[in-house]
């Protein structure tokens, strides 16, 4: 009988690819690699007992198909001019997502697209003279751009009431309002999409182990030793992998740290929680059919942009408003209250201190949000829906976000980032994704960037297949309107977005 302890690692398995986390990012990369290298073996590890239970879960995010059609933080006003470059860039990336999803639907990898994507108009909303002027200027800057065609503008009571009856009821129209509207927006259930990806993965031979938490990643020559613990039995085992992707949400940074790669030195994470108001009145839910985004309060961070959102989840319409910010030291919704404190290292203390000194507005915003009760949250909703009643809404907890803090030189020492950040080692054998919005909406673009950075020597070989999956690969649709029109028509049909 062996003298080894009960929980000692068992005989090492091997895999070409280990994917950590059963969310939208890992499942997207897995699907992409199965298209490009179907002979590569893949193993997915997920600490929870099912897929898409953290940020990919449909009620843990707003489900916006982030194409910058309505999100005002992507079109800042600088010296009196609305800048659209970021919006165009995000829209380009969302077109890549549509093409990739369409290819997988055509290939039978993704099944019924209506389970995960549905047409919902995207609307930008402004109230008060300054915001109305901004909405008008934003509309003028975007309306003739090929990627934003079909956008309309209105600032009259009749049109507003026709399109947004819930928001019009009880409103004092002596205070000016304006909307820009585009019918071709979408609502996306990333949880359902993740499940479709992983169902197909299992059929194609990918091993998915739920209830397994990755505890460490260590280099072994050119490969990686991944130590995994069964959360139910306590047993541990090790897997040797050629490539590791850390798609573990808020836990990604610490896992990348355990791998010892220098590229994460000085990086830190700042956790931000969120709350939604979810409508419980079916009559009200049926009266609203749009995702309506407004402007964040002065001094508030981009994550606080308020929106009144139609959702389509498992074929049923829903309605939410938020998000309301909050704070907890947990890095995952199902994480530990010690997460933040465990993440502090000597090399990232300057980053934390630098951000603490610079981000007074964020601190003030979070304190204010944490102190809000239901009545205060309802007051914020009434700026959008004047006759909202407390009894028609319940508070639910959204997914946990960990904003990236990047190291910086003197005098800042650290900078708080509000997008997504891809980190990989110089050899391209391990990578991870950090950060938040626009996140899931641009997962295919993020994973293509990963392929280019980690598998650069294979990109020529993969070129034809990538163009088969994503016909606009290597091109900018903004400068090729004919290709955009062709792919738009194709994806509208394939994803069943033309159907009512």
UniProtKB/Swiss-Prot annotation:
InterPro entries attached to this UniProt entry: FAD/NAD-bd_sf, MQO
Subcellular location field: Cell membrane
Superkingdom classification of source: Bacteria
Names of required cofactors: FAD
Regulation: Activated by lipids.
GO biological process: one example: tricarboxylic acid cycle
A single GO molecular function term of this UniProt record: L-malate dehydrogenase (quinone) activity
Major localization class: membrane
Annotated catalysed reactions: (S)-malate + a quinone = a quinol + oxaloacetate
UniProt keyword Membrane, yes or no: yes
Note on how the cofactor is bound: The FAD is tightly bound.
Annotated protein name in UniProt: Malate:quinone oxidoreductase
Organism: Corynebacterium glutamicum (strain ATCC 13032 / DSM 20300 / JCM 1318 / BCRC 11384 / CCUG 27702 / LMG 3730 / NBRC 12168 / NCIMB 10025 / NRRL B-2784 / 534)
């Amino acid at each position: 009988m062996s003298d080894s302890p009960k929980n000692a690692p068992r005989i090492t398995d091997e895999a070409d690819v280990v994917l950590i986390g059963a969310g939208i990012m890992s499942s997207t990369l897995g699907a992409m690699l199965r298209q490009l290298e179907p002979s590569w073996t893949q193993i997915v590890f997920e600490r929870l007992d099912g897929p898409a239970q953290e940020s990919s879960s449909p009620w843990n995010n707003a489900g916006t198909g982030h194409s910058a059609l309505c999100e005002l933080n992507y079109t800042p006003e600088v010296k009196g001019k609305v800048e659209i470059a970021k919006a165009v860039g995000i829209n380009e990336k969302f077109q890549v997502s549509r093409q990739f999803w369409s290819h997988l639907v055509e290939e039978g990898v993704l099944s019924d697209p209506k389970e995960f994507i549905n047409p919902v108009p995207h609307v930008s909303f402004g109230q008060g003279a300054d915001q109305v002027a901004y909405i008008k200027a934003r509309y003028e800057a975007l309306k003739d751009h090929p990627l934003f065609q079909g956008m309309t503008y209105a600032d009259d009571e009749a049109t507003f009431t026709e399109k947004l009856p819930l928001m019009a009821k009880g409103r004092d129209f002596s205070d000016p309002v304006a909307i820009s509207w585009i019918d071709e927006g979408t609502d996306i259930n990333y949880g359902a999409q993740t499940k479709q990806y992983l169902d197909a993965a299992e059929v194609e031979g990918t091993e998915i182990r739920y209830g397994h938490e990755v505890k460490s990643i260590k280099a072994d020559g050119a490969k990686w030793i991944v130590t995994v613990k069964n959360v139910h039995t306590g047993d541990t085992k090790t897997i040797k992998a050629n490539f590791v992707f850390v798609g573990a949400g808020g836990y990604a940074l610490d896992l990348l740290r355990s791998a010892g790669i220098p590229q994460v030195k000085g990086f830190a994470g700042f956790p931000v929680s969120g709350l939604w108001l979810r409508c419980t009145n079916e009559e009200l839910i049926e009266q609203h059919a749009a995702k309506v985004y407004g402007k964040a309060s002065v001094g508030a961070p981009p994550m606080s942009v308020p929106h009144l959102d139609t959702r389509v989840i498992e074929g049923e319409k829903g309605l939410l408003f938020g998000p309301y910010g909050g704070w907890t030291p947990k890095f995952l919704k199902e994480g530990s209250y010690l997460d933040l404190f465990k993440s502090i290292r000597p090399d990232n203390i300057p980053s934390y201190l630098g951000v603490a000194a610079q981000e007074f507005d964020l601190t003030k915003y979070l304190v204010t949000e944490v102190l809000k009760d239901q009545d205060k949250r309802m007051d914020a909703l009434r700026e959008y829906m004047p006759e909202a009643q407390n009894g028609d809404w319940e508070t639910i907890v959204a997914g946990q976000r960990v904003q990236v803090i990047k190291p910086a030189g003197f005098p800042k020492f650290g900078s708080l980032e509000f997008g997504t950040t891809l980190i990989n080692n110089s050899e391209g054998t391990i990578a991870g994704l950090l950060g938040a919005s626009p996140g899931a909406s641009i997962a295919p673009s993020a994973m293509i960037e990963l392929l280019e950075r980690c598998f650069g020597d294979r990109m020529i070989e993969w070129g034809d297949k990538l163009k088969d999956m994503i016909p606009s690969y290597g091109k900018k649709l903004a400068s090729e309107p004919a290709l955009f029109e062709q792919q738009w028509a194709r994806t509208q049909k394939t994803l069943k977005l033309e159907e009512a």
